C-alpha cells in the first residue's frame, strides 16, 4: 500500500490485493468500503478506511501460486464532491449551515467541532463549481480546517477551527530514520525525510 493523508484535503490509498478468484469485477467493488488493519508497535491495530474509487486486474501473483493480483484506490466519501458541477444559491446561511446542507445528502458520518460562531451570509453562490472546491473555498475564507478519522469499517469527517479540539497521538515522539545513513527500516512509525522550503507569498490583504 502507498498512501497520502493531508489536513484539509482528501486522503488516497493505493492498494495491491491478492485473491484466489481470477474474475473479480470492478462493477461489484467500486463504491464499496474497504478497511486496512495495520499492526503497530503499541500492539493495538491502526485502521484505514475508505471507499473504492477504482479497481483493476494486474495478473497472476508471481510469489503466490494460484493467486491473482488486483489494484484499487481508496478515498473518502468527500471525494464524491469532486465529481459534480453545480450552480445554486444559499440564502441567510452560515458556512456551517451550508456545509451541513452540502454534506448531509451523502449519508456519511461527519461532525463539527468548531468553537466559533460564524456570520450569516445573506447571499452565497456556487456557480459551475464542484462541491468539494466550493466547500474548501468557504472553509479557507473562514479559517476552518478538516480531517478524517478512521475506525474498523468506517471513516468520519471532522470539521474544526481550533487546535484544542485535536486528540493527542498515542506517542508524542516519532523517531527520525534516514535511509541515506542507516540501512533497512525500523518496524515502527518513523520520519525518513524532513524538508524545509521557502515560498513567495502575498503579505497583505486589502478590501
Task: Please place each PLM-identified region on the residue numbering.
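Amphipathic alpha-helical and helix-coil boundary elements used as assembly
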Residues: 1-207
